[in-house]
């Protein structure tokens, strides 16, 4: 169903032109543009890392632009911080809700701006609740302002966030993946509120990857790719295939690889019926020795959650794990390591790498027992020799094994974590975003290392948000959406378009 309201086609409410933003070593945005009309829902789409969040954080005052101009109602404006954005009537509803569970609904809406009583000392609770109720009446929402937020469902908490934004007289709302944690009935209620806001002239920027939802709610869609603007089109005049083509249209790596046939190799890891709330829903897969199994999907699809669950970092509600054909119980990372499973987190500086320790101790961190002599003393020479051996094998660039890990490049830090699990004799390895934050040359080295590990019989799961990387490295690809495996692709048959189709649908398919 298409929106039944024709948005204002005159002067934009908000116009961003020529927006540029650079972070150390990365051009996040390059000559981007975006405009929002009063009384429209404008979808913003792009792959992970396309620059959507950075652009919206500039509009919300979280980041400062390095180039370009922002106009409201045709006049140039400066948005120095989130308060300035609020003063201009720009509100943002983050995917991670920013509420205090112990406070009431009304207290959350007006936190820091509570109406005061006669002498300006005490909060006027009656007026506080009355003002909140007035906003809910505008939203046609039956919600008691006195209810503690912690007692509400996620959907109701999201409504409180919207009410908070409206309390600033917001003329523009940015919604980042607003339906990620909602069921169908809750999505319908959210869409009703969005349509009401649109009818009252509020402009809404809607960030989502869910094509079926965008068909129902969006008037226009803008696509970004690699930090650049691609196109803006009316939603009624485009197709899912066209949008996906715009999202993944960058030139692929020209290097071609013929993955080895691992179909006859021993199954190293088998997962059946893995579930944890809404994050992981009946996930099952097999992983063979010598195989690189790619996990693709959009942000929030559940890939990292699966890896953490198998590694014992997060509890599960149900599921069976078999290692080399044997059923095992994994409740903690120590259990996983005991069965030869290693996990390289996407956030290596906080999980997996002791950033303040030296190279030697980081490599030996998970294998300290083997270096204990007579139950009391550490074999410092043995640790040093082992660390030096892996520094040579993995070509870790460091002046010595005594160098603090924090002084090494991202690529070399990643190699240290790999060395740690190899020293621990792990033969099943989960790599979560293995090349995030490292340069092109270091990426190539990591790719070669993964290939070498697979050739040596290691069983590898590689989670990556970069589709060219998934296509280049994987022998087989599983795609996830909303906690489910929605499809499996053989490397020879996989394309970016097929992956994106599976990453934006909710039912399982096998494409070939």
Curated annotation (Swiss-Prot):
Reaction equations catalysed: D-ribose(out) + ATP + H2O = D-ribose(in) + ADP + phosphate + H(+); D-galactose(out) + ATP + H2O = D-galactose(in) + ADP + phosphate + H(+)
- Give the bilayer topology: Peripheral membrane protein
Pfam families cross-referenced by the UniProt entry: ABC_tran (PF00005)
Localisation: Cell inner membrane
Question: EC number(s) on record?
Answer: 7.5.2.11, 7.5.2.7
Give start-end of the signal peptide.
none
Q: Enumerate the InterPro entries for this protein.
A: AAA+_ATPase (IPR003593), ABC_carbohydrate_import_ATPase (IPR050107), ABC_transporter-like_ATP-bd (IPR003439), ABC_transporter-like_CS (IPR017871), P-loop_NTPase (IPR027417)
The EC class name is: translocase
Do you know which PROSITE patterns this protein is assigned to?
ABC_TRANSPORTER_1 (PS00211), ABC_TRANSPORTER_2 (PS50893), MGLA (PS51260), RBSA (PS51254)
Which keywords does the record carry? ATP-binding, Cell inner membrane, Cell membrane, Membrane, Nucleotide-binding, Repeat, Sugar transport, Translocase, Transport
GO cellular component terms, A-Z: plasma membrane
Question: What residues bind ATP, as annotated?
Answer: 46-53
Please report the stretch or stretches of sequence annotated as the ABC transporter domain: 14-251, 262-507
What SUPFAM superfamilies does this protein's entry cite?
Answer: P-loop containing nucleoside triphosphate hydrolases
Predominant subcellular localization, coarse grouping: membrane
Q: Which GO terms describe its molecular function?
A: ABC-type D-ribose transporter activity; ATP binding; ATP hydrolysis activity
Superkingdom to which the source organism belongs:
Bacteria
Q: Which SMART domains match?
A: AAA
Annotated family: Belongs to the ABC transporter superfamily. Carbohydrate importer 2 (CUT2) (TC 3.A.1.2) family.
**Chain's role:** Part of an ABC transporter complex involved in carbohydrate import. Could be involved in ribose, galactose and/or methyl galactoside import. Responsible for energy coupling to the transport system.
Q: What is this protein called?
A: Putative ribose/galactose/methyl galactoside import ATP-binding protein 2
């Amino acid at each position: 169903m298409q929106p039944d309201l024709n948005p204002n086609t005159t002067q934009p409410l908000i116009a961003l032109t020529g927006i540029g933003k650079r972070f150390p070593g990365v051009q996040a945005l390059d000559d981007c543009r975006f405009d929002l009309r009063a009384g429209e829902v404008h979808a913003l789409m792009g792959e992970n890392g396309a620059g959507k969040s950075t652009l919206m954080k500039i509009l919300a005052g979280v980041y400062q632009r390095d180039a370009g101009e922002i106009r409201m109602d045709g006049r140039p404006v400066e948005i120095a911080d989130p308060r300035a954005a609020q003063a201009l009537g720009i509100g943002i509803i983050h995917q991670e809700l920013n509420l205090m569970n112990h406070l009431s609904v009304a207290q959350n809406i007006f936190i820091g701006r509570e109406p005061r009583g006669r002498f300006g000392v005490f909060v006027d609770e009656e007026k506080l609740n009355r003002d909140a109720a007035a906003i809910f009446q505008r939203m046609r929402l039956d919600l008691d302002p006195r209810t503690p937020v912690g007692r509400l469902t996620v959907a109701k908490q999201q409504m409180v966030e919207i009410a908070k934004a409206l309390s600033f007289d917001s003329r523009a709302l940015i919604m980042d993946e607003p339906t990620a944690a909602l069921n169908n009935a809750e999505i319908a209620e959210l869409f009703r509120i969005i349509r009401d806001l649109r009818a009252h002239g509020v402009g809404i920027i809607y960030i989502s990857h869910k094509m079926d939802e965008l068909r129902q709610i969006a008037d226009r869609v803008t696509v970004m790719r690699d930090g650049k603007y691609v196109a803006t089109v009316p939603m009624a005049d485009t197709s899912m295939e066209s949008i996906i083509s715009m999202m993944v249209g960058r030139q692929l790596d020209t290097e071609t690889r013929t993955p080895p046939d691992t179909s006859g190799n021993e199954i190293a890891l088998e997962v059946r019926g893995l579930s944890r709330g809404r994050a992981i829903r009946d996930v099952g897969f097999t992983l063979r020795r010598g195989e690189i199994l790619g996990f693709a999907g959009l942000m929030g699809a559940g890939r990292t959650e699966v890896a953490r669950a198998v590694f014992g970092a997060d509890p599960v509600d149900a599921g069976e794990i078999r290692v080399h054909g044997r059923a095992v119980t994994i409740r903690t990372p120590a259990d996983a390591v005991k069965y030869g499973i290693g996990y390289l987190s996407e956030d290596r500086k906080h999980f997996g790498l002791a950033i303040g320790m030296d190279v030697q101790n980081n490599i030996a961190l998970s294998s300290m027992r083997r270096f204990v002599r007579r139950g009391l003393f550490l074999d410092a020479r043995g640790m040093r020799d082992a660390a030096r051996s892996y520094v040579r094998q993995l070509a870790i660039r460091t002046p010595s094994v005594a160098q603090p890990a924090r002084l090494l490049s991202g690529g070399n830090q990643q190699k240290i974590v790999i060395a740690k699990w190899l020293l621990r004799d792990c033969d099943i390895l989960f790599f979560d975003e293995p090349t995030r934050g490292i340069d092109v040359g270091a990426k190539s080295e990591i790719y070669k290392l993964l290939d070498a590990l697979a050739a040596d019989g290691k069983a590898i799961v590689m989670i990556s948000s970069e589709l060219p990387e998934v296509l280049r490295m994987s022998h087989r690809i599983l795609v996830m959406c909303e906690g489910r495996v929605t499809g499996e692709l053989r490397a020879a048959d996989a394309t970016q378009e097929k992956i994106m189709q599976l990453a934006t649908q909710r039912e399982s398919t096998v494409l070939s």
